[in-house]
Amino acid sequence: MIVVAAQAQMPGVSMNLPLKIISTDFDGTFFAEFANPPVPDELQRLIQRLQTAGARWVINTGRDLSSLLETLARAHLCVRPDYLVVVEREIYVHERNRYVGLEDWNRACAQAHEELFARVRTDLPRLMAWVNERFDAAVYEDSYSPFCLIAENNSDADIIHDYLNDYCARVPSLTVVRNDVYARFSHAAYSKGTALSEIARRLSVGPDLILAAGDHLNDLPMLSREHARWLVAPSNAIALVKDAVRKQDGFVSDEPHGHGVARGVQFFLESAGVAETSLNSKT
């Protein structure tokens, strides 16, 4: 069930953990669709123990809300995220067995996108024509963006991405959000990173107490010391993500997906002097 609250009340977090917020991308990072299980049991148990000790877990994804909730239900996890960031910008908090939209943030986000997209709408036919004349790609509009792309392959997506970036450079606040062959226009002020920091602001948690894990281009805004001190990339992350994480003294695992995330969380807990066995072990 999804409801909207004017101002969701967020309880404070325990003060005895070096990680107060764990923000994970979903597909390819926390969740591996073709793995069995899609989320390693060890990662689920680790997150569960951290939550019991007072940490908050955020799934930070490009999926829309219905798609994410459906996949979570089918995965039969033993843990539940405290917060959801969907389509890289909308925030929901778990309260009383339901996810409640943060109305003030989500309303401002929707208004900012509406105003921005109104400014670029007259240019869209030209942009779509440029893509369609050169590539076998799907270009379309949905409820989240007037320009969405599914390229045939990553090489085509790279070229189209460069073209769109050149256009965005001439339009204040416009950016391209990309994951693999998928891309769409978005407002630069609303990203995985700014949404994570908004959650942290409401919880009175600074970036030094936040861990973020991701694998692809749309994760780069949150894989930044501006938003999180502890940065993690699994072995399946693309090279640009691994480079960004390494340059900020983050952890690049030699294991993929959820196993890699677990290694990263364990590494930073140990670096901060917290042994995993010292967490609540009843779960």
Model-predicted segments: where are they?
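Mg2+-dependent phosphoryl-transfer enzymes with acidic/Ser/Thr/Gly-rich catalytic loops
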Residues: L17, F185-S186, G193-T283
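Structural motif
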Residues: I21, Y83, L209-L211
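Active-site phosphate-binding/coordination module
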Residues: V39-D136
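Short, surface-exposed amphipathic charged segments that create phosphate/polyanion-binding patches used
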Residues: E95-D104, S191-K192, F267-A272
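N-terminal amphipathic/basic-hydrophobic helices that include classical n-h-c signal peptides
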Residues: M1-S14
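Short loop/turn segments at strand-loop or loop-helix junctions that form parts
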Residues: I22-D27, V87-R89, Y144
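Conserved acidic, metal-coordinating active-site core of Asp-based
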Residues: P125-A213, L217-E226
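Asp-based phosphoryl-transfer active-site loop
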Residues: P18-A35, L223
